[in-house]
């Protein structure tokens, strides 16, 4: 009788274990606590980011399929590239319906490729899907930076990404070149923070070769080079940027250099008042006055000088923390290996150089203090010590020190945008993805931060711009730098 009795008990045991596992999963993930973690904890952004990308894929497809495409510059881009593909290298002769070609050579090459892929520019729907891919790729790069820094709660980025009609319109309904330039820029920023300097310089120079607004990041990048690399290696990276520009512009520089430089790097170009987003309250005469333009340039330079010292301090602190990371990471890895070995049932042999791999008292104190400071900065609570005596693995998110690098870059760009002679609607992508970071770097309350982002979105969605929307946009540009 014993065997049947034993057999009858086995299924019951299995069902109990299965039920316990399911209950454990449900208790761990399907509850309010985990939902709050996903929304509020910056450390959850890698998980939330995957859902954001999937949702954005659906949103972009719906926008492309349901919202009519608006022709603004796409045909003109194709006409300008067609002239180049037909053998014209004189920039003064490359024109489209909206005027002459005013972008550097990388723009010509990229849109020439799109010219062929889209059947001489006629397959606009295919171009829209290509730009949807550009949007998703750039968003992935942006989310990677935010995940590293752990500065902004995930719900902020979710709301920011899903609620901006203007951004989706610029990418998949207008096909401007600004998204291409910004994509290359964020690729460069990721590479710089990974300390892949030459590749980062290459992408940065390519971004400048698509549109010159990327140069707004250049002052911060110069200081970042100097802080990380020193003078000689900085000169080398600047040479990389310069050589790439020469290679890109070679077909034009070797044939009609003056026309190329005058056309693609024209800093004195006059913008049309009817398209301005930020200076609607000015008369056309004042808007086009060169004294006004020089005044804005002077203000830009003064603000850059004012922020130069704190920027340098931030970058120096970033470099010091990276060096500490390089020193401690091998020891952290070794310490975790030893802890893992201690958990094994086998006898651990005596290690001759045991003390060499152990942390010193100063290093242990630094790790504890640094971890507490990072938890405090992100609003997280310290993890309570476990009741059991089993040792825990050492771990620290050193990438959070990227906060010291990202803020100066984003602030430098914001200063340039705020001092621009004119902003057109597609220029919103220049700084849109950095706005949550800038807002959450201020000491303002949650309500004020959200108000700033909402007001900026309102200003860029007001078409045509009004005196109020232009003035409000300037107000929102002043608030973050004033506190930072």
From Swiss-Prot:
Cytoplasmic membrane side: 1-43, 119-125, 193-211, 255-294, 425-426
Transmembrane segments: 44-64, 98-118, 126-146, 172-192, 212-232, 234-254, 295-315, 404-424, 427-447
Catalytic EC class: transferase
InterPro entries xref list: Glycosyltransferase_ALG3
Chief location: endoplasmic reticulum
Subcellular localization(s) per the UniProt record: Endoplasmic reticulum membrane
Gene Ontology biological-process entries: protein glycosylation
Domain of life where this protein originates: Eukaryota
GO cellular component annotations of the record: endoplasmic reticulum; endoplasmic reticulum membrane
Segments on the Lumenal side according to the record's topology features: 65-97, 147-171, 233, 316-403, 448-484
Regions annotated as coiled coil: none
GO MF: dol-P-Man:Man(5)GlcNAc(2)-PP-Dol alpha-1,3-mannosyltransferase activity
Membrane topology of this protein: Multi-pass membrane protein
Family statement: Belongs to the glycosyltransferase ALG3 family.
Role noted for this protein: Probable alpha-1,3-mannosyltransferase involved in the N-glycosylation pathway. Involved in glycosylation of the TNF receptor grnd, regulating its ligand affinity. Required for normal epithelial growth and architecture. Suppressor of JNK-dependent intestinal stem cell proliferation.
Record-given protein name: Dolichyl-P-Man:Man5GlcNAc2-PP-dolichol alpha-1,3-mannosyltransferase l(2)not2
Species per Swiss-Prot/TrEMBL record: Drosophila melanogaster (Fruit fly)
Gene symbol of the encoding locus: l(2)not2
């Amino acid at each position: 009788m014993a065997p049947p009795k034993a057999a009858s008990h086995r299924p019951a045991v299995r069902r109990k274990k299965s039920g316990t596992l399911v209950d454990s999963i449900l208790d761990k993930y399907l509850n309010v606590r985990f939902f709050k973690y996903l929304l509020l904890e910056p450390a959850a952004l890698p998980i939330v980011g995957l859902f954001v990308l999937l949702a954005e894929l659906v949103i972009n497809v719906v926008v492309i399929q349901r919202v009519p495409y608006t022709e603004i510059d796409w045909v003109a881009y194709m006409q300008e590239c067609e002239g180049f593909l037909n053998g014209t290298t004189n920039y003064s002769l490359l024109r489209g319906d909206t005027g002459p070609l005013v972008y550097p050579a990388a723009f010509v090459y990229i849109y020439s490729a799109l010219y062929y892929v889209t059947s001489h520019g006629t397959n606009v729907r295919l171009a829209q899907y290509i730009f949807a891919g550009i949007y998703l790729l750039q968003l992935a790069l942006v989310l990677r930076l935010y995940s590293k820094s752990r500065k902004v709660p995930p719900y902020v980025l979710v709301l920011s990404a899903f609620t901006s009609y203007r951004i989706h319109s610029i990418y998949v309904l207008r096909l401007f070149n600004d998204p291409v330039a910004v994509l290359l820029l964020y690729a460069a920023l990721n590479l710089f923070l990974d300390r892949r300097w030459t590749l980062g310089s290459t992408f940065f120079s390519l971004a400048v070769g698509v549109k010159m607004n990327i140069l707004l990041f250049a002052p911060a990048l110069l200081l970042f080079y100097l802080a990380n690399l020193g003078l000689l290696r900085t000169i080398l990276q600047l040479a990389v940027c310069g050589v790439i520009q020469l290679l890109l512009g070679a077909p034009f520089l070797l044939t009609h250099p003056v026309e190329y430089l005058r056309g693609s790097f024209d800093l004195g170009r006059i913008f049309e008042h009817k398209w301005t987003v930020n200076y609607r309250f000015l008369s056309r005469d004042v808007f086009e006055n060169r004294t006004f333009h020089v005044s804005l340039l002077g203000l830009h330079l003064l603000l850059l000088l004012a922020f130069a010292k704190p920027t340098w301090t931030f970058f120096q602190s970033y470099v010091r923390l990276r060096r500490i990371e390089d020193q401690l990471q091998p020891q952290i890895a070794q310490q975790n290996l030893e802890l893992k070995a201690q958990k094994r049932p086998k006898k651990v042999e005596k290690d001759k150089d045991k003390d060499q791999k152990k942390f010193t008292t100063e290093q242990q104190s630094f790790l504890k203090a640094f971890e507490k400071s990072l938890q405090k900065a992100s609003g997280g609570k310290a993890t309570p010590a476990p009741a059991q005596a089993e040792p825990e693995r050492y771990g620290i998110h050193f990438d959070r020190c990227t906060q010291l690098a990202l803020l100066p870059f984003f602030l430098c760009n914001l200063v340039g945008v705020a001092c621009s002679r004119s902003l057109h609607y597609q220029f919103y992508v220049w700084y849109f993805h950095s706005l949550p970071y800038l807002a959450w770097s201020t000491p303002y309350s949650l309500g004020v931060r959200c108000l700033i982002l909402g007001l900026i979105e309102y200003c860029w969605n007001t078409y045509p711009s009004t005196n109020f929307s232009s003035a409000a946009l300037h107000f929102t540009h002043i608030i973050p730098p004033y506190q930072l």
